[in-house]
């Protein structure tokens, strides 16, 4: 059982390479240190990506995220570094990382970074009518 943080991201083969589909992940407990004060910064990371040939392995992602816990870094830098490392590991068709940092000095900071694979174009969205919430009994 691994009990140490790691910068090593692992991947596995995308089981459905013929289709664009979105993988959505929420990482509610990201921490790093403010490079100016050494105080902890906390953020909720949201990762959305459309894989190409590889997907990110979750345990390695957890250990990778953990590796920033004692690292001093600016919000903008860490968001872009994480995105760059994920792009190198997976080479996805599309990836977006949103970092929502908790209040610091009365200011909330949100950083959004994204990458599109050269030559990839998303399919146009399909909007479907919503249904009312369903219950197991009819009224």
UniProtKB/Swiss-Prot annotation:
Origin: domain of life = Bacteria
Reactions the enzyme catalyzes: 7-aminomethyl-7-carbaguanine + 2 NADP(+) = 7-cyano-7-deazaguanine + 2 NADPH + 3 H(+)
> Which amino acid positions bind substrate, per UniProt?
56-58, 75-76
Q: Name one Pfam family in it.
A: QueF
Q: Which InterPro entries match?
A: GTP-CH-I_C/QueF (IPR043133), NADPH_dep_7-cyano-7-deazaG_red (IPR050084), QueF (IPR029500), QueF_type1 (IPR016856)
Q: What is its main location?
A: cytoplasm
The reply to whether NADP figures as a keyword in the UniProt entry is yes
| GO MF annotation list | preQ1 synthase activity
Keywords assigned by UniProt?
A: Cytoplasm, NADP, Oxidoreductase, Queuosine biosynthesis
Instruction: Work out whether the entry's keyword set contains Oxidoreductase.
Output: yes
Q: What's an example GO BP annotation here?
A: queuosine biosynthetic process
Q: Where in the cell is it found?
A: Cytoplasm
CC per GO annotation:
cytoplasm
Recorded family membership: Belongs to the GTP cyclohydrolase I family. QueF type 1 subfamily.
PANTHER family, alphabetically?
Answer: NADPH-DEPENDENT 7-CYANO-7-DEAZAGUANINE REDUCTASE
Task: State what this protein does.
Answer: Catalyzes the NADPH-dependent reduction of 7-cyano-7-deazaguanine (preQ0) to 7-aminomethyl-7-deazaguanine (preQ1).
| Protein name, entry field | NADPH-dependent 7-cyano-7-deazaguanine reductase
């Amino acid at each position: 059982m691994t009990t140490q943080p790691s910068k090593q991201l692992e991947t596995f083969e995308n089981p459905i390479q013929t289709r664009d589909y979105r993988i959505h992940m929420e990482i509610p407990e990201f921490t790093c240190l403010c490079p100016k004060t050494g105080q902890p910064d906390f953020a909720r990371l949201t990762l959305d990506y459309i894989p190409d040939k590889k997907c990110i392995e979750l345990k390695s992602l957890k250990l990778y995220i953990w590796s920033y816990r004692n690292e001093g870094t600016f919000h903008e830098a860490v968001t872009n570094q994480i995105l760059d490392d994920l792009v190198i590991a997976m080479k996805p068709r599309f990836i977006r990382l949103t970092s929502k940092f908790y209040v610091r000095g009365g200011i909330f900071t949100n950083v959004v970074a994204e990458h599109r694979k050269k030559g990839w174009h998303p399919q146009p969205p399909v909007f479907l009518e919503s249904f009312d919430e369903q219950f197991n009994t009819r009224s």
